[in-house]
Amino acid sequence: MKFVIVGGGISGWLSALIFSHRKPNHEYVIIESSDVNTIGVGEGTTGLFVQTIEQLPDINVAEFIRETKATPKIGIEFNNWSGKGSTFFNPIDGTLTTNEDFDSFLYFTYIQNSSLDTSSLHGLLKRKNKSPYTEKLKDYNSALHLDNKLTIQYLKSKSLKRKNIKYISDTVSKIERDETGKVEKIICSNNIIEGDIFIDCTGYSRIFSEKSDWVSFKNNLPMNSVTTFTRKHNVSMVTKADKLNLGWC
């Protein structure tokens, strides 16, 4: 069976690594266009991302964090959303504070009027400004902040070492389907690629669904624009979302 993944990026290269590991006896082709620029913004994950790449034999979590300059993300702090001066911290993943000998009834009676971070390891880390790992990474289940470009480069380098992954640098110009609408082949500038299963990792381009019915939620999205910029500051393990009169930052 031949899998065709259209689009590089984190989703494309990670799909190639996961599928080719889970189903190593199949053929995998990934098409990436040099005409499409990488969006140079930060990315955030959940702890499930780390658990996922841990299962890949050619990826070491410590190496991944070092090469991509990733930093821990233990939660999101919402400021002023319930009134000026209010704060709510939402931990992302992290183990609950558990003890088999602890009387859970008394414990939950205590925290019933407390915030979520009372029962979360990440809530404690946030209050103490501590990192969720030491020199040796073990049972690392924290979310991460990622550098998008560095992460793509890392995943791509690992993918290209797999013998069952073929890389094609080309630009898709047309999608050919059968009478039922199933994709049969992809016409590129310099290649025609056929396959059995096609995976769309083209992001906003949505090349496989561009002609599908579209349901707009524009009227339900009062905040429909964003301005991005970078600034120098100490690395934080918490994403802050401060409510403003118009929108948030």
Predicted regions and their residues:
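Beta1/beta-strand and adjacent pyrophosphate-binding region of the FAD-binding site
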Residues: M1-G9
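A structural signal for isolated positions on well-ordered beta-strands in alpha/beta enzyme cores
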Residues: V4, E27-V29, K166
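N-terminal Rossmann-fold NAD(P) dinucleotide-binding loop
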Residues: G12-W13
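Glycine-rich FAD pyrophosphate-binding loop
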Residues: S20-V41
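A short, surface-exposed helix-loop junction/capping segment
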Residues: Y28-S33, Y133-Y140
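Dinucleotide-binding Rossmann-like beta1-alpha1 core, especially the glycine-rich loop
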Residues: N37, V41-R127
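Predominantly flavin-linked oxidoreductase catalytic cores and closely associated redox partners
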Residues: Y140-C249
